[in-house]
């Protein structure tokens, strides 16, 4: 689906199956001035006042309704399109009864002159919710192929790199009635987002200075590679630690640290070199696992997570608790797990200081 006017990709121009309307992001991200923005507008043919709603969809046969999974790519060279990079797992999910959509945010990515230094993260998150608005409409419109086939009560977001930072922010915005910097900008999202997967997420943006994002009552999975040369630390651990379960429903959160995985091989559009030339020439790629094996891990863990979160198959929680139970499926290597659910009770967390 797309606006039908893309000048670089036919699948979002003449070949798109469902036409969408462009959206105005200027209240959140102004691209109207500067040489870099001028170059970008020449390349893309649009700016922040008319961002397209483009996406690739994989879906199962049958009437449904099927849970909806949105994939959000991260930052890369904008002309090397990132949204096709998750087909390997989207096709698997479609075969298991999910609608999977990989959305296009390439126009927010880097070019030869640099990137937006994470100032675009809010816009990345807001665009996720604008895509979900389209899905809500299609599910209610008889003249669309997705009429009454989407289970809008069971939605999950899967974000990679900056997409991994945008996804949890989208969950926060989803519950807000107005833009926190301008109350004249009303929001009316209120989607039923049940789960979130962060793949090697960044963590450089916060809605409040020096205050990390806090989530509650949602299922969470973090995948992080030990040989990541883009996101050097496990930035997603903040989300894990700041996610709290406060209602009476069952929720869970899990981390898988993959020693020999890098940043880019979770996407077929990126690859083994996490940093651009000439710095990439300094990388020692020998210890990395192969891309197929790394993506096999992502397929295994993300599908198990979604089955547990959106379909209530708690038997899939076993590998999220202990990677050794998946040894017959995933490549041989070093892994570390972390897991907690709403039944977990703290006896002591050693945060009491002198008041013990």
Model-flagged regions — what are they?
Residues 213-291:
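Active-site-adjacent alpha-helix of alpha/beta-hydrolase-fold enzymes
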Residues 178-202, 218-219:
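A conserved short beta-strand
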Residues 1-64:
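Short conserved active-site loop signatures built around small residues
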Residues 81-103:
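Short amphipathic alpha-helix adjacent to the substrate-entry channel of hydrolases
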Residues 64, 115-161:
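Gly/Ser-rich "nucleophile elbow"/oxyanion-hole loop immediately N-terminal to the catalytic nucleophile
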Residues 259-263, 269-356:
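Alpha/beta-hydrolase-fold serine-hydrolase catalytic core, especially in secreted/extracellular enzymes
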């Amino acid at each position: 689906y797309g606006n039908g006017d893309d000048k670089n990709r036919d699948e979002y121009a003449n070949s798109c199956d469902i036409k969408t309307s462009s959206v105005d992001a200027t209240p959140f991200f102004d691209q109207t001035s500067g040489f870099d923005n001028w170059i970008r507008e020449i390349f893309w043919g649009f700016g922040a006042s008319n961002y397209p709603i483009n996406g690739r969809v994989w879906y199962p046969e049958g009437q449904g309704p099927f849970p909806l999974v949105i994939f959000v790519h991260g930052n890369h060279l904008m002309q090397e399109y990132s949204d096709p990079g998750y087909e390997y797992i989207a096709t698997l999910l479609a075969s298991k009864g999910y609608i999977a959509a990989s959305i296009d945010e390439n126009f927010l990515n880097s070019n030869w002159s640099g990137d937006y230094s994470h100032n675009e993260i809010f816009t990345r998150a807001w665009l996720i919710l604008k895509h979900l608005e389209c899905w809500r409409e299609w599910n209610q419109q008889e003249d669309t192929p997705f009429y009454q086939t989407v289970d809008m009560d069971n939605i999950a977001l899967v974000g990679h790199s900056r997409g991994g930072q945008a996804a949890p922010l989208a969950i926060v915005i989803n519950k807000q009635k107005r833009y926190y910097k301008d109350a004249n900008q009303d929001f009316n999202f209120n989607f039923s987002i049940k789960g979130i997967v962060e793949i090697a997420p960044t963590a450089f943006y916060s809605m409040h200075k020096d205050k990390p994002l806090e989530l509650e009552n949602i299922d969470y999975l973090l995948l992080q590679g030990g040989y990541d040369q883009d996101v050097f630390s496990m930035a997603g651990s903040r989300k894990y630690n700041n996610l709290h379960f406060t209602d009476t429903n069952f929720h869970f959160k899990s981390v898988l640290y993959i020693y020999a995985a890098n940043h880019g091989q979770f996407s077929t559009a990126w690859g083994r070199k996490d940093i651009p030339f000439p710095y990439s020439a300094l990388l020692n790629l020998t210890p990395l696992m192969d891309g197929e094996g790394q993506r096999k891990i992502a397929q295994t863990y993300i599908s198990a997570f979604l089955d547990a979160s959106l379909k209530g198959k708690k038997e899939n929680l076993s590998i999220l608790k202990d990677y050794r139970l998946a040894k017959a499926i995933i490549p041989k290597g070093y892994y570390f797990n972390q897991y907690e659910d709403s039944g977990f009770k703290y006896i002591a967390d050693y945060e009491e200081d002198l008041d013990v």
